Design a protein with these regions (language model features):
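Short beta-edge/loop segments at beta->alpha junctions of small alpha/beta modules
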Residues: 1-2
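Exposed, interaction-prone assembly regions rather than primary DNA-binding/catalytic cores
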Residues: 5-63, 89, 95-107
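Hydrophobic alpha-helical interaction segments
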Residues: 52-131
Length: 131
């Protein structure tokens, strides 16, 4: 979009890139400002692509926070890591991405209650406080 960020990869591909799963997705999910519907499926080459509308407009400033929260919402479903190993991986990602809990808080209300449960169980909510 004229050199501006308008989306990000989501779900299994992002979990795989973070090293949280060894699964290689057969389909790719993209969250994009360009999505015209809440959910659309298409194909590119031999890959199935799912395009979703973002919860809020995606920008260069917020895409990492939104991508991280999307992942965290489903971390209990897709992650092959748990406990301290998972916590360390999530904390490391937050450090590398320059994310603080304060960067994420304004987006919490756009996510289901399950996010709050995962924030506590992974201890991400305590990053920088008790870590």
């Amino acid at each position: 979009d004229n050199g501006r960020r308008c989306g990000y990869i989501s779900v299994l591909l992002f979990f795989n890139q973070m090293g949280l799963t060894t699964q290689v997705p057969m389909q790719y999910e993209i969250v994009s400002n360009k999505a015209t519907n809440e959910y659309r499926e298409t194909s590119l080459a031999k890959s199935r692509i799912i395009i979703r509308k973002p919860k809020v407009p995606v920008t260069e400033k917020n895409y990492m926070a939104l991508q991280f929260l999307d992942m965290l919402k489903d971390v209990d479903v897709y992650s092959e890591m748990s406990g301290t190993d998972l916590q360390k991986r999530l904390y490391q990602y937050m450090r590398d991405a320059g994310l603080e809990i304060s960067d994420l808080e304004s987006y919490f209300s756009y996510y289901p209650d399950k996010l709050y449960k995962n924030l506590i169980e992974t201890r991400v909510i305590y990053n920088g406080i008790l870590a």
